[in-house]
């Protein structure tokens, strides 16, 4: 996912 989404959804990035 994009880094914009990582900022919005940090838990999904784990």
UniProtKB/Swiss-Prot annotation:
Keywords in alphabetical order: Antibiotic resistance, Leader peptide
Pfam families, per database record: Ery_res_leader2
Single biological process term from Gene Ontology: response to antibiotic
InterPro entries to which the protein is assigned, alphabetical: Emycin-R_leader_pep2
Summary of the function given for this chain in its UniProt record: This peptide is involved in the control mechanism of the synthesis of the macrolide-lincosamide-streptogramin B resistance protein. It acts as a transcriptional attenuator.
Name of the protein described by the UniProt record: Erythromycin resistance leader peptide
Organism of derivation: Bacillus anthracis
């Amino acid at each position: 996912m994009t880094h914009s989404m990582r900022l919005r959804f940090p838990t999904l990035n784990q």
